[in-house]
Amino acid sequence: MNYSDDFNFNNYLSSRNRSLTKDQKSILDFYQKKISLESFCEIEKIEEYNYISLEIGFGTGDILLHNALNFPNNLFIGIEYYKKGIAQLLLNIEKHNLKNIRLFYGDAFAYLKQAKTNYLDEILIMFPDPWPKKRHWKRRIINNNSVNEISRSLKLNGKVLFYTDDKSIAFWGLRYFILNKSFTWAINKPLDCRKRTPSNYITKYESKALKKNIDPYYFCFIKEQ
């Protein structure tokens, strides 16, 4: 049995994108062109923001919404494959009349390849799908190619925040960032990665982990070359 026989990625996405409400369907249709890959280059023409943050796989958009509301002078970009999450965040963006968020629907790697060199100040990868089965590891967002593109698109001294409650993908991601010569792991001692920064916003998945007495991994990598 080959990989495509064993797992249909399109069916997986379809199952996650079901049950859109009428309002969610309507707002997705309205913003269809603005959240497409073709419109990504338009972001880079925006010059009024001094700090630009990208979140890969923002889920329901809790962090993006929180940050955009609290830091109106920063630009926040989000990429997601989950239509329901995009739609819900679009509704919240309209509700709060936010101008400092840009959203994109699709594959994060495709967007990273489109980004300008030395463009982003930070990249967030918060509790990504761990794809626990070995045959699905190729689906993990962190790999050699994506880390290279992350490095290229980040400014010097830019940072990557990578949080997860899954041990397998924690060490998987750590390995790829450590092996990339551009990044330094911002840590004093190894166990520091199990301590969260109190000021950080607690996401839905982080909250679930903490309620189960699971201490997530909190990684910060700095681009130093």
Predicted region positions:
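S-adenosyl-L-methionine
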Residues: M1-I52, D62-L69, L90-T117
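Class I SAM-dependent methyltransferase "Motif I" SAM/SAH-binding loop
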Residues: G57-T60
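A short acidic, Gly/Pro-enriched loop at the edge of an enzyme's catalytic core
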Residues: K113-E122, F127
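A short glycine-rich, Lys/Arg-flanked "PGG" loop and its adjoining helix->strand segment in the class I
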Residues: I142-L156
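Class I S-adenosyl-L-methionine
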Residues: R175-Q225
